[in-house]
Amino acid sequence: MDNVKKQIISILSGIRSDVKDWESNTQLVHSGILDSLGIVELIGELSDTFDIEIPPQEIVYENFDSVEGLVKMVERLSE
């Protein structure tokens, strides 16, 4: 597992400690694991951890509904 993915899973585990299985394709928003407050918290944590700015146009379902979507977004914004 790459470093970005490990860090994202660690952040998600901090937000939702009750969830134990963070598969790459688990639907985070659709399944209710992340709600609007969780997404706001996640944005702050991702920004701080990866030293990135997440612009409003990146806050879309596709980027936040899976670990894989989050990894792709973080890698893209880190370039």
Identify what each model region corresponds to.
Residues 59, 64-77:
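C-terminal structural segments of small proteins and small subunits
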Residues 13-33, 51-60:
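Phosphopantetheine carrier-protein modules
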Residues 4, 24-25, 63-66:
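Short, conserved alpha-helical segments within structured domains
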